[in-house]
C-alpha cells in the first residue's frame, strides 16, 4: 500500500524535474553552440 502511495509522487517529481531540466539543458546547449559558431 505504501508503494502505491509513494509511486505517483515519485513520477510527478520525475516529470517536473525532467520538464525543467530538459529545456534548460537544450537552452544552454544552443547558447554555447551559437557562441562557438559566431567565433
From Swiss-Prot:
The keyword Transmembrane helix applies. Its main location: plastid. The chain crosses the membrane at residues 14-30. GO terms for cellular component: chloroplast thylakoid membrane; photosystem II reaction center. Its cofactor is heme b. It comes from the Eukaryota. With its partner (PsbE) binds heme. PSII binds additional chlorophylls, carotenoids and specific lipids. PROSITE patterns: CYTOCHROME_B559 (PS00537). The keyword Kinase does not apply. Belongs to the PsbE/PsbF family. This is Cytochrome b559 subunit beta. The gene is psbF.
